[in-house]
């Protein structure tokens, strides 16, 4: 799989998780077979850019390429500036967070709360893509509320804006992490757009990884919670996908 000019070593990606996927954890996951990893989200609020937390999250020293920095916020201009800052800081890919379901993030109209305003989504996508000369990716969910899934429109608009790849968690914000991931909609998105689609949600075993890839036709899978305390899951999945056998 390619993200812009960058060919990943495989199609297994570490999902961005605030407070979890710091640089040491990303490095560990890559050591155990992940082909790519996305950073923890970093706020687009420039007044917080020099905080201890922000500086720690923006430390990519020694990280294996390609380096992907995720940004979060709701103002298109602020997000564009944050993207430029991360590129100057060493990021080779910028990821926009429209998937975080956390209350404190959504209360600021960031993360998955953005899915309530498709016009704002479009402005953010256009502005950030135009702001940097590196690939811009999007991480998102099916929609904000159950019964109001708007991911097909958002995915098409992302492709039109020049987004290089779309990572999709198969739940709405209302679902949080309850119910089951809806791979049927991920499959529809994959059939709708031509850019790479990354399937996310409930992938916790080699068998599940193969099923999701086969069923959705996704270009890659993204694993988050299942990698906590078990970063070698990437090696297990890669071996199973390549041989049909367990390590």
Language-model-detected regions and their locations in the chain:
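Flavin-dependent oxidoreductase catalytic cores
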Residues: 1-247
């Amino acid at each position: 799989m390619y993200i812009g000019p960058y060919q990943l070593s495989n199609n297994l990606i570490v999902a961005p998780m605030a407070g979890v996927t710091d640089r040491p954890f990303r490095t560990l996951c890559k050591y155990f077979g992940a082909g790519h990893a996305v950073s923890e989200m970093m706020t687009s609020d420039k007044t917080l850019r020099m905080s201890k937390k922000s500086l720690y999250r923006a430390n990519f020293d020694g990280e294996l390429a390609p380096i992907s920095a995720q940004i979060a916020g709701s103002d298109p201009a602020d997000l564009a500036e944050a993207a430029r800052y991360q590129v100057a800081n060493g990021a080779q890919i910028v990821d926009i967070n429209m998937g975080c379901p956390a209350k404190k993030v959504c209360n600021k109209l960031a993360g998955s709360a953005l899915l309530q305003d498709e016009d704002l989504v479009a402005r953010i996508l256009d502005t950030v893509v135009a702001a940097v000369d590196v690939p811009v990716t999007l991480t998102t969910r099916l929609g904000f509320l159950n019964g109001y899934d708007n991911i097909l429109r958002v995915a098409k608009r992302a492709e039109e804006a020049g987004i290089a790849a779309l990572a999709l968690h198969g739940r709405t914000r209302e679902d949080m992490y309850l119910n089951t991931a809806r791979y049927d909609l991920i499959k529809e998105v994959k059939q709708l757009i031509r850019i790479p689609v990354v399937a996310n949600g409930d992938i916790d075993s080699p068998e599940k990884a193969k099923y999701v890839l086969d069923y959705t036709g996704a270009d890659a899978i993204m694993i988050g919670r299942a990698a906590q305390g078990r970063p070698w899951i990437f090696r297990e999945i890669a071996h199973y996908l390549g041989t049909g056998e367990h390590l």
